[in-house]
């Protein structure tokens, strides 16, 4: 679920992304390395997938996109951007990243 304080930010992101609606857009969910401890998610990978899916659904609801050009992926704790040894680092790793690729070469 998208937090209220993130909705305005995501609305602005959606306005930017619509300019790239013919490119390939990937929405990636990530987590820290602390195992999830609730019954809603089986593991961190499923939590990260849900994060990406939630952002995808919200962004698509704000603007008209070609759904086939948007990919979602959940990477769990496999791609940290900071150390998981500190709370600050773990907070940075709990994120959603949005990447825009050239449609002709989606490896860029």
Model regions: which residues?
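Periplasmic OmpA-like peptidoglycan-binding domain that tethers envelope proteins to the cell wall
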Residues: 1-20, 30-108
């Amino acid at each position: 679920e998208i937090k209220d304080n993130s909705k305005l930010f995501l609305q602005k992101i959606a306005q930017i992304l619509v300019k790239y609606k013919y490119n390939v857009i990937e929405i990636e969910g990530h987590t820290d390395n602390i195992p999830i401890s609730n019954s809603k998610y089986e593991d961190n990978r499923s939590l990260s997938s849900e994060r990406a899916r939630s952002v995808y659904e919200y962004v698509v609801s704000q603007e008209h996109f070609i759904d086939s050009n948007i990919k979602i992926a959940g990477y769990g704790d496999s791609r940290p951007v900071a150390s998981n040894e500190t709370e600050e680092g773990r907070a940075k790793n709990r994120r959603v990243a949005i990447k825009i690729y050239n449609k002709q070469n989606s490896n860029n």
